[in-house]
């Protein structure tokens, strides 16, 4: 496991993800009111990029079939998604947002 830089804290807008590609993994990092959260950027229902979906109240909606996920826990909240998203630890080091993968 290694920590990966996403960017300076001041470059994050609330509810707007930043996406980082690490090998085959696409990780979306969100700044919510209570902190930073990292999830797999690919919907578990069908291949769609969640970072292109609608984010509100700590939830991300898939742009393809409107499946919703909790950004903090990765939990699938609405059909058609039934499988939770992978989540990753985050931290802020010297003003830079990082996630562990």
What is each model feature region?
Residues 1-57, 71, 75, 83-101:
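N-terminal pre-ligand scaffold of iron-sulfur
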Residues 43, 62-65:
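Short cysteine clusters
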């Amino acid at each position: 496991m290694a920590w990966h830089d996403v960017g300076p804290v001041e470059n994050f807008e609330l509810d707007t993800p930043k996406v980082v590609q690490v090998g085959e993994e696409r990780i979306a990092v969100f700044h919510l009111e209570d902190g930073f959260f990292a999830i797999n950027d690919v919907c578990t229902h069908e291949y769609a990029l969640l970072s292109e979906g609608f984010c509100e109240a700590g939830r991300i909606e898939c742009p393809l079939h409107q499946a919703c996920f909790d950004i903090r826990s990765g939990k699938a909240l609405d059909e058609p998604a039934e499988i939770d998203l992978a989540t990753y630890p985050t931290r802020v080091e010297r003003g830079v947002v990082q996630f562990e993968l």
